[in-house]
């Protein structure tokens, strides 16, 4: 505490702990008490978790924002309608009128969106299908409720290099007195690992690093963008998904950056 300013740096172990919020608050309070906030070399700083999780967050998977942290206001949608080259009214037609500008369900509360009655959830119907893409609920609480919710779904899709805890939980026998939805479909789609594809990764400091492929994808696994493109093709907007990929083909630091290849 005598060497000031000093910083506290933590990773996912603290953030995703069952009392992670309290632990993060305690770190910030400690730094405030020591006078280390607002100074170069000080602060309470978090390192992101899995490979390229910062880049994944930047493109907008969070339920309360469009890509680039634009939020969900009408102006944000109009901005991205221009960026994507689609009509704003067409985008509106993809959503229920009262849902478009509301924050979605967080990853820790999806259980409630499945199990609660409609009047307790801020949406028209309960969640019927769920994708776990590169994510597993190992660090989340309410394991029994999570199992009940998985049993109630109509569709569960797990996209991961390995059968994750999500896939294992879906295959577990139901608790006594609980039944599995007889119409439920569960799919495990094998995604390639970070070593089996090339591309950019964004670090916690927002620096971008090019990553070369080490080996070809093993067995039936394919890179995430190939899986995403396959879904887009089947849903009828495959060309829209990849039409702007050419924007990534440029020269930087004397090197030609390759355009992603969609098969």
Task: Describe these PLM feature segments.
Residues 1-29, 33-39, 46-262:
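Non-catalytic alpha/beta scaffold blocks inside enzyme catalytic domains
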